Amino acid sequence: MVVNCFETCRAIDFWNRRNQLNFPGIVRLEHHQVILKPFNGTWENSEKPENQRKNRYNIRCWDHNRVILKSGSGSTSNYIHANYVDGFEDDKKFIITQGPMEETCNDFWKAVWQNNCSIIVMLTPTKGTNGEELCYQYWSLNEDSNIITEDFVIETVNTSVRPTYILTTLRITDKISNDSRRISHYQYTEWPVDETPTNHVDFIKFIKIININRKKSGSNYQQQLLSPIVVHCSDGVKKTGIFCAVDISLNQLVLRKTVSLAKTAEKIRQQRHSTISTPDDYLILQPGYYVLLYLLYKILAIIKIKNCGEKKSRRKST
């Protein structure tokens, strides 16, 4: 029986859990407790007949924190399958959404524009292994070319292929005001469809890159409050939920030296329907935590060695 799985624990205590017998079984029992946690949310907007065609899959979208679009170009619909999700001590850090469809491409860019977003994280290829569409090609792959939607022109400025992701700089222009903004589009390429990230260390490094550039972007635009990061995969729940959970845990670990996996999973599920919905989703998080803890202890060890060296130098000088 798992006891107090929703309590926050010290990083060292979480680290020691790896030595427990039947560790995967314990994790699955924890996930079962997360799933059983009641939450009285509604999803009426996602099931309206006029909105169902905007849902890529038959997945609900919470009403209480959904992204509400402003009308434009004669459209009266304010619906997009997207929710605001909090980071660690960072309200509305993310906008989690599904992979855009051709029909919802303008809505996707409207959400980006209206929320002043400067970073998009894409965790899926556009096509599956059998050629099925997982995500519409909502930007141009060619530099100095663009796509045009009802409200926006999206130009591809440049593309840089990195070992684990592709960084594309985009320029979005509002067709009415003619105002433009730059968007950094990060497509992570080391997460195969229906599998786990190829390398947990690379995945964590990718998340750190996103966080660093979000802060830089806020400084460039002199924003007091950083704008949300748009995160999507294909269904907008599985990979995106894991991405946000690891990001939250990384920041909690660095800032508080504590871990609360069950609480994190519970909160994400209350803000984005169907996230971390299977025991395997929950289990995927565990190796990532161990890598985080390992890296943290390496950093602390380096700092400790450095401090000891400085103390010895002072003694010699005196």
Swiss-Prot record:
InterPro entries (UniProt xref): Prot-tyrosine_phosphatase-like (IPR029021), Protein-Tyr_Phosphatase (IPR050348), PTP_cat (IPR000242), Tyr_Pase_cat (IPR003595), Tyr_Pase_dom (IPR000387)
Catalytic reaction list? O-phospho-L-tyrosyl-[protein] + H2O = L-tyrosyl-[protein] + phosphate
PROSITE patterns with a match to the protein in the record = TYR_PHOSPHATASE_2, TYR_PHOSPHATASE_PTP
Q: Which major enzyme category is it?
A: hydrolase
Q: Example GO molecular function term?
A: protein tyrosine phosphatase activity
Matches recorded under Pfam families: Y_phosphatase
Report the active site residues.
C233 (phosphocysteine intermediate)
Name the source's superkingdom. Viruses
Protein EC: 3.1.3.48
Keyword annotations of the record: Hydrolase, Protein phosphatase
Boundaries of each Tyrosine-protein phosphatase domain copy? 26-292
Q: Which SUPFAM superfamilies match?
A: (Phosphotyrosine protein) phosphatases II
Q: What family does this chain come from, according to its entry?
A: Belongs to the protein-tyrosine phosphatase family.
Protein name in the entry: Probable tyrosine phosphatase protein N1
Organism (species) = Microplitis demolitor bracovirus (isolate Webb)
Q: Which gene encodes it?
A: N3
